[in-house]
Swiss-Prot record:
The gene is parS. It comes from Streptomyces paromomycinus. InterPro entries: DegT/StrS_aminotransferase, PyrdxlP-dep_Trfase, PyrdxlP-dep_Trfase_major, PyrdxlP-dep_Trfase_small. It comes from the Bacteria. Belongs to the DegT/DnrJ/EryC1 family. L-glutamine:2-deoxy-scyllo-inosose/scyllo-inosose aminotransferase subfamily. Gene3D superfamilies: Aspartate Aminotransferase, domain 1, Type I PLP-dependent aspartate aminotransferase-like (Major domain). This is L-glutamine:2-deoxy-scyllo-inosose aminotransferase. One of its GO terms (biological process) is antibiotic biosynthetic process.
Amino acid sequence: MTRSLAVQGGSPVRTRPWPLWPQPAPGAVRALDGVLTSGRWSISGPYRGAASQERRFAQAFAAYNGVEHCVPAASGTASLMLAMEACGIGAGDEVIVPGLSWVASGSTVLGVNAVPVFCDVDPDTLCLDPAAVESALTERTKAIVVVHLYSAVAAMDALRALADRHGLPLLEDCAQAHGAEYRGVKVGALATAGTFSMQHSKVLTSGEGGAVITRDAEFARRVEHLRADGRCLAGQPVGDGQMELVETGELMGSNRCVSEFQAALLVEQLGVLDEQNERRRRNAALLDKLLADEGYRPQTTSEGTSTRTYYTYAARLPEGELTHVDAAAVGEALTAELGFPVAPCYAPITRNRLYDPRSRGRFALGVQHESRIDPKRFELPVCEEAARRTVTVHHAALLGDESDMHDIATAFGKVVRHGALLTG
């Protein structure tokens, strides 16, 4: 093998293609064709004598997660906002969120006129640190949002106990954890409600989409109203050609519904989710061993995790190695070796260029409010260290075979051994 790195003009470890994502389920095309000719393309379309695809997916996803209620929504972002609004969160309320996550963890709180309070994470799981949450609570705290990040499930025993002790709703952001379990219970079913994203990159995808799940019938009814312009599904059968949404006037909402095309696709993709998750899990276990041999520290999950899933495979750089460069430079080198993106983990939301409340006039609600939502007021040392020293691989690579995992490990080892050549 050449001593020079591919990023500097050397030969890469691999030139063969990697698995593509998304991968359509066997019945996906047939399901989409069925919607196309059904005469109903949305939940607000007329009843045609059969259950809507939206209802079919809602029932299937609720059953899959072991809960009574699922309300599909337009996106993971919409789902988070719906869940927060269903909790009654609004102007001036504080919501605890992790500092290490996609920017939606903060922007959704702003979107309901509340104040995101960013907390540090556990250095091994990269999920919300219960001790940091405890320290951040104030009389204005109205909810805690926990994100199951990358491939880890958060410390739900401690977080649930904390939320219960303070009488706070606990919301699970499961956008990256479809199918994961904690003490035998699916994530999303462990707290007040769980929210999901079905965006293009997710392990269960319809391109865009989301869902809120809960065991609470009244909570689900509020979510239904909030996502369908104040309307909810009829509690009894309607006649052919009639709309299934009823205008109750109970709660004003907006349109955050999925289309019948998205719902039909999700019904089919749900059928292959467990099989795909198992393949990722098997390959990730091999990769854990291979990368540990090279000195990397793969992300761990909380004690109590009974089924782990992988949206992203994350690993910390070897101790004492590559200290002269950041994870972005290492990711660029690994990308050149492997031919697919290897990226640093999320930047802390507080300094993410995509999170800037000052850029939106809607958040200019006075000096006091603007001071409270200023992300610069938070210090997140664990988030900062993770961003500097952690690289990530998208789950599509984990749908390969064992030889693919060996290629990944070879590239990771090569970059460590020749890391002195890197700059940046």
